[in-house]
């Protein structure tokens, strides 16, 4: 016991050192600002404001939480400030869905609405022709301007959106997931049986927040799962999701046959008590669907799906996640944990896309959605996977129909199988397309997909690829908060305001680094050319000259 206590103190010391030295998130030419609520005046919604050299500014959705506020001291092991605790204490113990159905707007709903607008309601564009031309095609989505707390309440009540916010995760900053809102991106972290520690996972969490992760899933499968999860939750301002099956399996030393409903139930309660915001539950993998996957090229590629299929065959019984689904609903309702219904039969190769097994499970997901809603539990549906571009639209169409417009949460999809080491690119192509079609949450893919556990650089590259995909979809949908950043960056580029161009980029450091590889001096930041075209062939420079000539003529 003494040795175990000493080790725990040592880990706490290491975490304190890390948080003291490395847990500050900074962005160039940016400051933390706060927007006040109107329905709930005590609400202060943190955002990022970029200051431009011409006097303009841009307000951005910010996932960095208190880590980017120099006035907030983050202490370990206590973790982040408990933002939602005062709201939770003074109201009945109900889910956000239950409140929404009763017509009640919660502080979380107003908070999420303020985040979605990013102060865009204060900015008016006077070029009406340009607005009409670039208004976007939202397909069947309805995106109001501005987004109001009442609109968010109604979307939650109808099951078209979720606000994942476990009552035991008061550190989280409320956010909304649904196709009528900004497309969100999830990052996966977590240890394996071979590598990683508590300190490394907290470092990965904060790194993911730095690069824009809207939600984070802890997919730890090795030792110290509970300790890692507790530390992540206490230090996370974004919703945290898990796959409880992984810890349940760890409790029986990886013996699938020894897994029972009782072990899983206790694991579920334990994780809900800690504060996990959403659970991936593979309740749609039914006995009768397992043979459908046998003719596939790559079989069952979902970890949770393959484990439950094996359990069903070993016991010759139906999936206990399905047979005990109402009991799972009761547990999740008690803590306001949201469902992320797992796609255990998702295709793991282009050859298996849109097959009978995949869509059979999707139909069951839709049935389970309706049960979850009956119990007042929020739900979203997980989707593929590996899908060629020409089959992506069918996935979105079927999900909207089978699942009654519940939020769709997809892993990519990867549009080709030939890109190991570059799967973040191949999948971001599919992610942009399906997000435009209506997918609400994109699970990022890193360059290490299919190859190994991602490191910090992999996390960054995966998130950048997926933030591009999400933003491209927001532009295509015509989200009112999407285009201003593009316009400001384009103006800075045309006016040769190099520092502004860098600072408005998703990755300012890389943009500046690439420019400075050939033109490193400060004088080059004021030059009217870059190394690609040089001073004589720069089209922007020539375009300025053309404008000047036309003005003189007219």
Curated annotation (Swiss-Prot):
Cofactor: [4Fe-4S] cluster
Source species of the chain: Coxiella burnetii (strain CbuG_Q212)
Domain of life: Bacteria
Annotated positions binding [4Fe-4S] cluster: 530, 533, 538
One term of GO molecular function: zinc ion binding
Gene: thiC
Primary enzyme class: lyase
Keyword DNA-binding: no
Protein name as annotated: Phosphomethylpyrimidine synthase
UniProt keyword list: 4Fe-4S, Iron, Iron-sulfur, Lyase, Metal-binding, S-adenosyl-L-methionine, Thiamine biosynthesis, Zinc
Gene Ontology CC annotations of this record: cytosol
Pfam families xref list: ThiC-associated (PF13667), ThiC_Rad_SAM (PF01964)
Similarity-based family: Belongs to the ThiC family.
Catalytic activity annotation: 5-amino-1-(5-phospho-beta-D-ribosyl)imidazole + S-adenosyl-L-methionine = 4-amino-2-methyl-5-(phosphooxymethyl)pyrimidine + CO + 5'-deoxyadenosine + formate + L-methionine + 3 H(+)
Residues holding Zn(2+): 386, 450
Known pathway: Cofactor biosynthesis; thiamine diphosphate biosynthesis
Record note on quaternary structure: Homodimer.
Keyword set includes NADP: no
Enzyme Commission number(s) from the entry: 4.1.99.17
Main function: Catalyzes the synthesis of the hydroxymethylpyrimidine phosphate (HMP-P) moiety of thiamine from aminoimidazole ribotide (AIR) in a radical S-adenosyl-L-methionine (SAM)-dependent reaction.
Residues binding substrate: 188, 217, 246, 282, 302-304, 343-346, 382, 409
